């Protein structure tokens, strides 16, 4: 692990030089008040980032991470509550009457052994919930999110004349297992604390260069449902299949037939994916087993499409079992799910214009929705109009070279994922402060005008 003095040296000798030398990063001779405010907290935000990066913790085990964030927010004057929904953190800063706006960060890291070669790379190893020895890494950039949120929190606390209302900061555990948001809600997140008028969340991406942010009006992330099917047959000798009911063959037929649900039952233009990640059965090549297991991930955006896919999978599984003469119908279990993240279109358009006015023309990029999932959707389902946006963290030159050669930079969840930290933090804090100051004005009714429901669209 690096000492704090060494962390400081890295910031000054490495990150600051990197910020000045990266193509596409402009350093203005004249700084705005917000630029100066961001610069004033940047060294401490970098220290926090490097510390978090070296001390990653797995989902639902973020005890050190949560305590570190809570202590720092408490020092800034926030009213902090810990252990919400497990290791969750809620920090409230009241600044007179006005709207309530929520800003969320995730706390957890991934069971990935870091291979970036960075001087501050994680060397943490631990046991996961199944007892396996695993490396641990912030391979999804949640350390960038936390450090940005802390810097934003500091600027908002030190410049209370620029906004009014209630700022609600959320440190959410277990995003990677899509369980943390729901646990916080069940633990009274919106009953023990003010229910926000607007919710904000940011996620980093190596698909955009530093200095740019991405927005997606409407559906941004997909419904995600995990389905496990146990197919029951009748085992026997592989040389005498006529005495058996082969569950492997039934599973194979299910695997093929379910694809027709997408291609023949879902309207063209409605996104839908059924992927089978595993079929497991048997112990020996000449033994037909008694059963087989299949694992599915099912993705969609629209609620009706989601229900059609899930019902169709169960229908196909039972039909194929009946066709094979199975005496026992398959067991179909949905064991892990989260809904789509929906960005309020009116709010998104408003904040996109606001961000471009501060970050510069061309800095806001409209992105297509993607089929990955995010349990921030649980907050949206509670009736919180939201804006979920992406933060570019890629070296502009490396990204351009990769695109020119038809390659992609190491993405989130890769052991090589390495955001360009200082400019990413700077843009992240600038974007978050800009959004919060824009929304934390007027009355709750005023801020609701920026949402689809109140705009009547």
Where are these regions (language model features)?
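Bacterial N-terminal signal peptides
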Residues: 11-26
């Amino acid at each position: 692990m690096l000492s704090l003095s060494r962390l400081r040296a890295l910031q000054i000798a490495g990150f600051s030089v990197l910020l000045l030398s990266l193509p596409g990063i402009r350093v203005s001779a004249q700084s705005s008040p917000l630029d100066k405010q961001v610069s004033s907290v940047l060294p401490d935000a970098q220290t926090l980032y490097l510390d978090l990066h070296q001390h990653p913790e797995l989902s639902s085990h973020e005890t050190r991470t949560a305590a570190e964030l809570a202590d720092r927010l408490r020092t800034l004057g926030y009213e902090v509550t810990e252990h919400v929904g497990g290791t969750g953190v809620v920090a409230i800063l009241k600044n007179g009457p006005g709207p309530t706006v929520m800003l969320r960060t995730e706390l957890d890291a991934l069971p990935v052994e870091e291979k970036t070669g960075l001087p501050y790379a994680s060397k943490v190893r631990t046991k996961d919930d199944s007892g396996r020895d695993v490396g641990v890494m912030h391979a999804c950039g949640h350390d960038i999110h936390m450090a940005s949120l802390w810097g934003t929190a500091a600027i908002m606390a030190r410049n209370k004349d620029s906004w009014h209302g209630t700022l609600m900061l959320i440190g959410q555990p277990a995003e990677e297992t899509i369980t943390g948001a729901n646990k916080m809600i069940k633990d009274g997140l919106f009953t023990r604390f003010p229910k926000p008028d607007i919710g904000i969340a940011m996620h980093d991406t190596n698909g955009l260069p530093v200095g740019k942010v991405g927005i997606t009006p409407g559906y941004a992330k997909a419904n995600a449902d995990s389905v496990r099917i146990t197919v029951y047959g009748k085992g026997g000798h592989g040389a005498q299949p006529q005495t058996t009911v082969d569950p492997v063959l039934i599973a194979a037929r299910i695997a093929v037939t379910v694809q027709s649900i997408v291609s023949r039952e879902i309207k063209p233009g409605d996104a839908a994916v059924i992927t089978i990640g595993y079929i497991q059965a048997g112990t020996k090549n000449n033994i037909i087993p008694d059963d087989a297991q299949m694992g599915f991930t099912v993705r969609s955006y629209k609620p009706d499409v989601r229900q059609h896919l899930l019902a169709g999978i169960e229908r196909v599984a039972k039909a194929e079992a009946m066709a094979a003469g199975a005496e026992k119908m398959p067991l179909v279990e949905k064991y892990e799910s989260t809904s789509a993240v929906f960005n309020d279109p009116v709010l998104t358009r408003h904040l996109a214009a606001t961000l471009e006015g501060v970050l510069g023309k061309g800095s806001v990029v409209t992105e297509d929705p993607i089929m990955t999932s995010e349990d921030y959707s649980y907050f949206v389902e509670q009736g919180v109009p939201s804006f979920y946006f992406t933060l570019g963290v890629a070296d502009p030159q490396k990204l351009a070279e990769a695109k020119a050669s038809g390659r992609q930079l190491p993405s989130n969840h890769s052991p090589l994922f390495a955001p360009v930290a200082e400019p990413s933090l700077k843009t992240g804090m600038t974007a978050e402060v800009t959004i919060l100051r824009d929304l934390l004005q007027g009355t709750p009714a005023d801020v609701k005008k920026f949402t689809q429901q109140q705009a009547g669209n």
